[in-house]
Every structure is written in structure tokens, then in C-alpha cells.
A protein has these predicted regions:
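Accessory carbohydrate-binding/adhesion or oligomerization-edge regions at the termini
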Residues: 1-54, 132, 136-141, 212-214, ...
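Accessory beta-strand-rich segments of carbohydrate-active enzymes
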Residues: 8-13, 18, 27-32, 59-175, ...
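Beta-strand-rich binding/interaction modules
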Residues: 96-98, 189-222
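Signal that preferentially marks extracellular ectodomain short beta-strand elements
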Residues: 115-120, 232-248
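Short, aromatic- and glycine-rich surface loops/edge beta-strands on solvent-exposed regions
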Residues: 128-131, 247-259
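Surface beta-strand/loop "capping" patches
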Residues: 170-200, 283, 288, 582-590
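N-terminal carbohydrate-binding accessory modules
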Residues: 179-180, 254-327, 581, 588
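Substrate-binding/catalytic cleft of secreted carbohydrate-active enzymes
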Residues: 334-579, 585-590
Length: 591
């Protein structure tokens, strides 16, 4: 593992020229108190959690303990303005000091945050940074996904602390804090609004749109823009290139502020796409997902985003790109990002490659009664999948406390606001299999208030309340029978055929849904499932497929890739051929 991992710019949708990456070796200590440790335990490779092999530590942060980080740093080149310290994600709650001054903190293990550290900097240099972290894992109500202190089966080792890039940038005194970009496919426009750091909220802007390096639309601060703090630019018809998996066109966007002297103005770079999601009946009256007005078969994989050396954190940006490119080359167009939020570069690569993302809200809440929410409901799914998620059920689902429900609302808003700039995100998934579920109908309303451009899968698997756009089925054990519904039918989890590939076996007991004994058997069972079970259901209304899963994860050996991503387990040519057959059958069905 390199000593300066993940050096790439971490925020592609809001870029500046100033950038100083702080990934690398830091000092660390694990103690029983929040105070600065008397001594350091050793070095940790940031941004890898201490529980991971890649960190060089291999220790688990227990609830109630404190994880401390320390390093020196040099601010970005330049003078004046403000210096911002950015964290891609820290799990879960942290306090940050610079030169002994508390500069801020954050709670929430999956979302980026920035702190203005200018006033704490040492004029003579020699700046020092301390970060103190606590993580309750399964003892709290916060979002935690598949993390557990007792890993096994479908649950994985807990991790804590800094797990995404840490970086610095120098900005003007009045800088853009948030950029809201709203494309309108039907109107062929994009509306850009920015908020700035100084009082007053929205900024007066100029904006330029480029397509393939050619300027196609611009607004240099008109009176109309100055009045409402936003600019709307029209895309010429000859440069109207809708985004899709077959043609993932991205427009380049440059935005700047117009207030003050030139050195006080801010300029940022971004991008956007023109695409439109909808649900509509096909020629036979069966509800289908539509992208840019045309029915589309969403054919994808469940993606949990774990890596053997770094757990949540990939070994390199290149490894991420190679995996996504291979998935696309195998003929898939969809990834369901399951119980995790990725670093923003992951979504950027999906934007560029044309991979559609269904994004789960990361599950949290109190302890789940797994005997009910997972095992009993799975076995008796035909009877239980539409149980009302009313208050009497909240204790079984881990949402009995008001604090837990308030935490979920805060996390939902943070998730949508963080990721809605990415055109690859096509569907929000508020709940999965009842984990932490409550008032799914209210969650759908909250999502649509924040983003009305995407689909919503209200409750993936079960405890479906009849809302959202998707009738979302999980099926590992029963014969698959689909019939047309008022919502579009998705098979949002299925398959999961296990095979512990020789040389890539799991560290503990192998886990999956039925086990193959060889590559040939795995390939044959995959083909039979897809062509004999799934394909006939397309004409009955099945419109989205999410096979479990991208890769093996810890004990789970039901991935198409091995855990280390070194091999594709079934025959790749067979996978491509099956996906082509599914696409051809769907096209014939909706003609």
C-alpha cells in the first residue's frame, strides 16, 4: 500500500485549483478519554480505518473508546482568503483541533464536511492537526450499514474514524459553499444557483456551459441573474445530448461570483447531464421505467463496496475504475449501492461510464430483531411483505426511539443533498428489508421534496406500503411469479449463488444462497436462472434486475468477482451473452 494513497481530487462536482491532499501516515492512539493522549501508539495510514489491514493498525475501536489522530501540515500556497479543511467521511462523531484550538466537529459517518481553520493557523507555520473520534457502532441509533462488532454471514467487521480523503484548499473571503445545478430535460435548460460564505445567502453569478470543449451557453451576470441569485442557461438544440448508459454525455460547467474585487471572487468547475426518469405504460399497458421517454431494462448488481484490505476504502482510484468498467463491459447498466455511501469520485466514474445507481439510505436505528425482520419475513414473505410499518412494529424494526427517527430524517436529507448532483443516481431507496424502517410513506415524501427528478423505491424487499414508483421484490427461495402492477416491478435482490473460488476462499465460514462446486457449474446455474426463470417474467412486467452481488464480501462468496477483484468467477463471455439475450427479449417485449 502506498504511503500517499488516493491522491486524486475528491470532489469532482465542485472543483477549485487550490488543493492539498493530507492522506498518508498520521500518528494515532486509542484511549479511554477525549483528552489529547500522553503518547501515541504508532502510525496509521489515512484514510484507512484502524480496523483494516491497509491502515497498518488492525485494532477495533470499541464503543466508549476514543481514537485520536495527529499530524503536522502546511497550508495551501497563496496568501489571504480562507483555508478550509475537508473530510470526505469520518465514522462517526469527531472533534477537530488545529494548533490546540477547537475548530469544529461533525457527526455522521458517511457524509463530507468542511471546517474553516484560518483563524487557528500559526502565522509562522508549523501547523498541527488533531482529530478525536468516537463510534458507537451497534450500540447507537446512527446509520452504520452492515457494520457489526460480531461479524459473520451477511454482516461485516465494524470500522471507524477517517475513511475518506482529508484535504485542504484556499478560497476567497466570500467563497461558494454550495452549488445547486438543476437540469431540465424537457426545457433543455440548466439553472445554476450558488450560496456563499458571507451573509446574504445566494450569490450573483456568471456561468459558462461547454460541450466537448466548445462554449455553447453563457451568462455573465445579467440583471435577471443578479435579482434572484441564479442563472438559467438554454442548451442549443444542436448540442442537446441526453445522458444514458449508451451515451453518458456530460456538459462542463464553470461558475463564478461577480461581487467585490477580482481577487475576492470565486470560480468553481462542475458538470451536469440532461436526463429524465419516468414511469409509463408500454404498448401493452404494462408499467415500465423510462429514461428520456423510452422504456429501459435496468439490469444490474447489488454493490456493497467492500475491499479486503480497506473494507469501505478502496486500494486506489484505478481499482474503482477497473471494476466499474468491467461491470459495464459485462453488459450491466445498473448498480444498487447497498447500505453504504461511496466517496464522490465513485459516483463521478459512474456518471462518466453510464452506470445507473440505485442508492440505498444507509440503515441505522436500534438493534433489529433479526428473527422477525430477516429470517421469519424471508421464509413467510408472501404473507408478511406488505405488513404496515406503523408504530407497533417500530420496536421490532429498531426505530422505537424519537432520537433514532430524528437521526434518520437528518441522514436522509444529507444523503440526497450530497449525491443529487450526480446524474448516475436514478433511484433513492429509503429502506431495505425493514432494517430501521418506519413511516416509509413519509420518507418518500421527504425524498421527493429534496429531489423530484429520480425514482423512489420506498421499501426494498418487504414491509411495502404501496408508495413510491417501485414494487420491489427480493426473492432467493421461492418460484418467481410476476404480474403487472400499478407501479413498476423490480427484482431488487435475487440469485446469490455461492462458489468459494480456489485461492480466494473466505477467512471464515462461506455464506451464500446455494453453492456451486466449480466455475462450470456456477456459470450453468447463472445462465439457467437468468434465461429460464428471469427472462420469461419480462413480458409480465419485470423491468429491473439486481443480482446479488458484485463481489465476494468477507464470508459471502456469492459475488461475480472474487473479493480481491482478481478474477471473474463465472465465464465472462457467458455473462455478456446472457445480458444481451435479456436486453433483446425486453426490447421485443416493449415494441
Amino acid at each position: 500500500m502506498q504511503h500517499h494513497p488516493l491522491p486524486e481530487y475528491p470532489r469532482p462536482a465542485l472543483r477549485r485549483d487550490s488543493y492539498e491532499n493530507l492522506n498518508g501516515l498520521w500518528q494515532y492512539a486509542i484511549t479511554g478519554s477525549a483528552g489529547l493522549p500522553a503518547k501515541w501508539d504508532g502510525d496509521i495510514l489515512v484514510p484507512y480505518s484502524p480496523e483494516t489491514k491497509a491502515s497498518g493498525v488492525g485494532r477495533t475501536l470499541q464503543p466508549g473508546a476514543w481514537l485520536h489522530y495527529h499530524r503536522s501540515f502546511v497550508p495551501p500556497a497563496g496568501t489571504g482568503g480562507r483555508v478550509l479543511l475537508h473530510f470526505g467521511a469520518v465514522d462517526y462523531a469527531c472533534a477537530v483541533q488545529v494548533n490546540g484550538h477547537l475548530v469544529g466537529g461533525h457527526r455522521g459517518g458517511y457524509w463530507p464536511f468542511a471546517l474553516d481553520i484560518t483563524d487557528a493557523l500559526n502565522p509562522a507555520g508549523h501547523d498541527r492537526l488533531w482529530v478525536a473520534v468516537q463510534d458507537p457502532t451497534g450500540t447507537g441509533v446512527q446509520a452504520r450499514g452492515k457494520q457489526t462488532l460480531r461479524p459473520g454471514g451477511m454482516f461485516y467487521p465494524a470500522q471507524s474514524g477517517i475513511w475518506q480523503t482529508v484535504w485542504l484548499e484556499r478560497v476567497p473571503e466570500n467563497y461558494i459553499t454550495e452549488l445547486t445545478v438543476t437540469p431540465d430535460y424537457d426545457a433543455r435548460t440548466v439553472t445554476v444557483k450558488a450560496h456563499t460564505s458571507l451573509p446574504g445567502g445566494a450569490a450573483n453569478l456568471w456561468a459558462v456551459v461547454r460541450a466537448g470543449g466548445v462554449t455553447i451557453a453563457e451568462d455573465w451576470g445579467s440583471d435577471e441573474a443578479d435579482r434572484d441569485g441564479a442563472v438559467t442557461l438554454h442548451i442549443p438544440e444542436e448540442h442537446f445530448f441526453p445522458w444514458s448508459p449508451d451515451s453518458p454525455f456530460l456538459y462542463d460547467l464553470t461558475v463564478g461570483t461577480t461581487q467585490g474585487e477580482e481577487e475576492q471572487r470565486d470560480t468553481v468547475h462542475s458538470y451536469f447531464a440532461l436526463r429524465k426518469w419516468s414511469c409509463a405504460p408500454d404498448v401493452h399497458g404494462i408499467m415500465r421505467f423510462c429514461l428520456n421517454g423510452k422504456p429501459i431494462l435496468l439490469n444490474g448488481l447489488l454493490d456493497q463496496g467492500y475491499w479486503p484490505e480497506g473494507l469501505y476504502t478502496p486500494p486506489s482510484d484505478g481499482a474503482v475504475v477497473r471494476e466499474l468498467q468491467t461491470i459495464k463491459e459485462l453488459g450491466f447498466n445498473l448498480l444498487r449501492k447497498h447500505a453504504k455511501i461511496e466517496p464522490q469520485r465513485w459516483y463521478y466514474h459512474c456518471d462518466k461510464l453510464g452506470l445507473i445507481v440505485w442508492q440505498d439510505m444507509v440503515n441505522g436505528g436500534g438493534p433489529y430483531k433479526l428473527w422477525f425482520v430477516t429470517y421469519l419475513t424471508n421464509v413467510f414473505q408472501p404473507l408478511l411483505r406488505r405488513l404496515p410499518d406503523a408504530r407497533p412494529l417500530w420496536g421490532l424494526l429498531g426505530r422505537e426511539t424519537e432520537a433514532g427517527r430524528e437521526e434518520y430524517a437528518r441522514e436522509l436529507e444529507a444523503t440526497v443533498k450530497t449525491l443529487q448532483c450526480h446524474p448516475c443516481v436514478g433511484c433513492w431507496v429509503p429502506f431495505n428489508e425493514g432494517w430501521g424502517q418506519f413511516d416509509a410513506a413519509g420518507a418518500v415524501e421527504a425524498v421527493r421534496r429534496l429531489d423530484d427528478t429520480c425514482l423512489v423505491d420506498e421499501a426494498s424487499g418487504w414491509y411495502d406500503q404501496g408508495g413510491g414508483d417501485v414494487d420491489s421484490l427480493h426473492n432467493y427461495f421461492y418460484p418467481l411469479r410476476v404480474r403487472p402492477r400499478s407501479r413498476v416491478v423490480a427484482l431488487s435482490e435475487y440469485g446469490g449463488i455461492a462458489w468459494p473460488m480456489p485461492g480466494h476462499e473466505p477467512p471464515r465460514r462461506a455464506y451464500g444462497y446455494g453453492t456451486a462446486k466449480s466455475r462450470a457449474e456456477l456459470t450453468a446455474r447463472w445462465k439457467k436462472l437468468q434465461l429460464e426463470t428471469v427472462l420469461p417474467q419480462l413480458k409480465k412486467g419485470l423491468s429491473a434486475l439486481v443480482y446479488t452481488q458484485v463481489s465476494d464480501v468477507e464470508d459471502e462468496v456469492n459475488g461475480l468477482f472474487t473479493y480481491d477483484r482478481a478474477a471473474i468467477k463465472p465465464d465472462p463471455a457467458a455473462v455478456r451473452a446472457v445480458n444481451q439475450a435479456l436486453e433483446a427479449a425486453f426490447e421485443k417485449t416493449v415494441e
